[in-house]
Amino acid sequence: MVEQTELNRLFWHSRRGMLELDVLLVPFTQEVYPTLNETDRELYVRLLSCEDQDMFGWFMERTESEDPELQRMVRIILDRVQPK
């Protein structure tokens, strides 16, 4: 179970100041992060340490992360919002 303090901390780290990232990351943190396994939670935290411009390119699908694990997390987040 995820503690509320951890969720609060991640909520603020997910607010990037770039609207395109905020609309993806903030709801993901609130709605999906608590359901992730420990490995994916750690991966999400690692994703948050990346530069905004890098993440913007990944989420807009202009580029891909060189790290396949980070790219997998990007895909998890995008799959949540993209129509199937």
Swiss-Prot record:
Residue ranges that the Swiss-Prot or TrEMBL entry lists as coiled coil: none
Localization, UniProt: Cytoplasm
One of the record's GO cellular component terms: cytoplasm
Entry keywords, A to Z: Chaperone, Cytoplasm
GO aspect biological process, one term: succinate metabolic process
Major location (coarse): cytoplasm
Described purpose of this protein according to its UniProt entry: An FAD assembly protein, which accelerates covalent attachment of the cofactor into other proteins. Plays an essential role in the assembly of succinate dehydrogenase (SDH, respiratory complex II), an enzyme complex that is a component of both the tricarboxylic acid cycle and the electron transport chain, and which couples the oxidation of succinate to fumarate with the reduction of ubiquinone (coenzyme Q) to ubiquinol. Required for flavinylation (covalent attachment of FAD) of the flavoprotein subunit SdhA of SDH and other flavinylated proteins as well.
Similarity-based family: Belongs to the SdhE FAD assembly factor family.
Name under which the protein is recorded: FAD assembly factor SdhE
Organism: Pseudomonas putida (strain ATCC 47054 / DSM 6125 / CFBP 8728 / NCIMB 11950 / KT2440)
